[in-house]
Structures are given as C-alpha cells and as structure tokens.
Amino acid sequence: MGSSLYDILTIVMIAEFIFGNVTNGFIVLTNCIAWLSKRTLSFIGWIQLFLAISRVVLIWEMLLAWLKYMKYSFSYLAGTELRVMMLTWVVSNHFSLWLATILSIFYLLKIASFSRPVFLYLKWRVKKVLLLILLGNLIFLMFNILQINTHIEDWMDQYKRNITWDSRVNEFVGFSNLVLLEMIMFSVTPFTVALVSFILLIFSLWKHLQKMHLSSRGERDPSTKAHVNALRIMVSFLLLYATYFISFFISLIPMAHKKGLDLMFSLTVGLFYPSSHSFILILGHSNLRHSSCLVITYLRCKEKD
C-alpha cells in the first residue's frame, strides 16, 4: 500500500512539475516577447513576469528538495547547501505570494466602484500604491530571512554537537517545524490583504448589480464581466494558496515524519498552487489567452503537416 501510494504521488508530482513549468514559462516568454517587440511592458505585465519567474524557482526548489531527501535523507541537511536551499525557498515563496496579492489589489482598485474619497485617491494613484506595497513587502522579506537564518545557525550548532543519527533526525524535525511556522506567520498578512480585496470586490459587484437592476439594464455589461473575471482569478488564488497552507500543516504532523510519505504528500499538495494558478491567470488575461490560442493553433497546424 505504501509503495503504491508513493508511486501515485510521484506521478502526480511530476505531472504538476511539468505543467507548472509550461504555464509559468509561457507567461515569462509571452511578456518577454512583448517587452522586446514593443520596447515597453505594462506595470501588470512586469508583475506577471516576476510572479511567473518566482513560481518557476519555487517549483524547481520543491522538486530539488524532494530529490535531495530521497537520495540523502537527512545526511545532507547542513552547511552552505542547506542555507542556499532554505533562503531560495523563502524568497521565491515570498514573491510568489506578495506579487499575486498585488494583482488582487490591482483588480480591486481598477475595477471596483466606490465613492469614498480614500478609495478614489488610491484608485487614481494605483501604480504608486502598488509600488509602495512592493517596496514595503521587502521589509517583511528582510525580517523573514533574518529569522530563518537564525534558525539555520541554531540548527548548524546542534548538528555539530549531536553525533548520533537519531538525535540529528529529531533536531532537524524541530528545525523544519520552526521554519514552516515562520513561513505561515509571514504569509498571513498578504493572504489577509488578498482576502479583504476579494470581499470588497464582491461588495462592489453587488452594488453594481443593484444599480443595473434599478436602471433595468442587462447584467452582462463590461463592468460586470470585469468584476466576475477578476473574482474568478482572485478566488482561485485564495483557494489554491489555502491548499499550499495545508501542505505546511501536513508537514507539521508529528507522526508523519516517521512514515516517510509526509514530504511526498505535502509537496504534491503544495505544487498544485504555483502550477495551477498561473494557468488560471492565462485564461483570465486577454493578452495571455490570445497568445495561448495562437500557440495552440500553430501546434495544430504543425501536427497536420
């Protein structure tokens, strides 16, 4: 049973890895081509580009962690290699979450219609607001790196002191749990901001539909379509990142560390977020969707030839 489950999880993980690289690679390629051909790229184009790059790094980091664990178990978990892997994961995870949150804020400010002076002030200065948020989240990243680096230093000291294999394994379980808890703690703020943006956009859509109903106009006007499309992208991000959270909590289950399948299962669940959300971004953005249709048409023509 354990062997069969392991094989199934391996197949699913490889499929997610390929799918994630294809979808995120497509976003990177599309925006790079647009930038090179037009010599310019929209602000959201840059956000999409760096979001996709961060997710490619995150996907590869998760795969490398799995391969290292399968080959060397706990014996490699010390030194510069551990530091590089941990900090790369922290940085890629940070930007993957924060850039998606910035997209959610962009949808809210661009699409929602509120008459509050504060909202109108932010709406008219949307690029400056998003740039300030982007710069401000670097403070979170700095503190996160400092905290993780402290845990790494503590683990390195314990690794040198503890000679027996069992003691090193137990110490690493404690170290990994601390790192995961830090990741969860630093993810709460951007996730909450994205959730609030989603709720406000729902409220904006409700108000808009009320106005449309009173004026006896159709409900499928451009503003309604923009609201619905943005909400689809935002709810998919929230749900998929929630599964990513769940993968963290799975890794925190004490008994799972003794069975060997915890890493496989948590990585399989975790990979679903960076792989799938980028596909939804492609479907939700007209330029990416148009480019994907051109690629599919080209491939079909090549297949017929």
Curated annotation (Swiss-Prot):
Its main location: membrane. Keywords: G-protein coupled receptor, Glycoprotein, Membrane, Receptor, Sensory transduction, Taste, Transducer, Transmembrane, Transmembrane helix. Residues 1-7, 64-88, 150-182, 254-262 are extracellular. It comes from the Eukaryota. Residues 29-42, 110-128, 204-232, 284-305 are cytoplasmic. Expressed in subsets of taste receptor cells of the tongue and palate epithelium and exclusively in gustducin-positive cells. Expressed in 15% taste bud cells in circumvallate and foliate papillae but only in 2% in fungiform papillae. Expressed in the duodenum, antrum and fundus (part of the stomach). Coiled coil: none annotated. GO terms for molecular function: bitter taste receptor activity; G protein-coupled receptor activity; taste receptor activity. One of its GO terms (cellular component) is membrane. Glycans are attached at residue 162. The chain crosses the membrane at residues 8-28, 43-63, 89-109, 129-149, 183-203, 233-253, 263-283. It is found in: Membrane. It holds the Pfam family TAS2R. It is a multi-pass membrane protein. GO terms for biological process: detection of chemical stimulus involved in sensory perception of bitter taste; positive regulation of cytokinesis. Most taste cells may be activated by a limited number of bitter compounds; individual taste cells can discriminate among bitter stimuli. Receptor that may play a role in the perception of bitterness and is gustducin-linked. May play a role in sensing the chemical composition of the gastrointestinal content. The activity of this receptor may stimulate alpha gustducin, mediate PLC-beta-2 activation and lead to the gating of TRPM5. Belongs to the G-protein coupled receptor T2R family. PANTHER family: TASTE RECEPTOR TYPE 2, TASTE RECEPTOR TYPE 2 MEMBER 13. This is Taste receptor type 2 member 13. It comes from Rattus norvegicus (Rat).
